Amino acid sequence: IAVETATQNSKEWQLQRSVRITASSCYGLYTYSKNESPDWERKIQQYIKPKTLLTKEMRYGKQFEENAFLCYSRKRNPLIQKTGFVIQYDEPWIGGSPDGIDTLSGLILEIKCPFSGKENSIEWIIENCPVTKRYLKVQELNGDKRFTLNKKHTYYAQVQVNMWVMKCAKADFIIYSSKDDDFVVVEVDYDK
């Protein structure tokens, strides 16, 4: 399946995702389960037959994901390779599409290209972007910045499920700015 779906957003990729809980949908389903009066049939239909909504922010993210991948490969990890949709063989109803994998290091890559990166530096995105502040925590220690993901955000769940599916213990979650062709890395460990 991973080879057949290497081109994310292909018809095969969409088909494989439509019949499974995915890394990107799991948090929405988990938090929905706490709803006092859930309409599961309606909720599941959102995943089986998703409406194709492509905002300018989503178009921007898709447009610059390849640039981000190449920048990461050049500056941080030349062993990273693309992969398609991968299912967890022990639990074939769940799967994920990490943006890359380094099988030698047991590491996956997840890329985010916030729209604010079109006109702003990576420093600005980290320190000022209200969208980024929802999922990124910045701690300063002895003048060094340390980044972590908010555990109560969909991106954290997405990364964790992708690591579980790929049987990897680590992830590099990158936030990319096309303005300066640069990124920051949030190193994420698998949370058993």
Regions inferred by a protein language model and the residue ranges of each:
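Charged, glycine-rich intrinsically disordered N-terminal tails and low-complexity linkers that flank
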Residues: 1-71, 75, 118-150
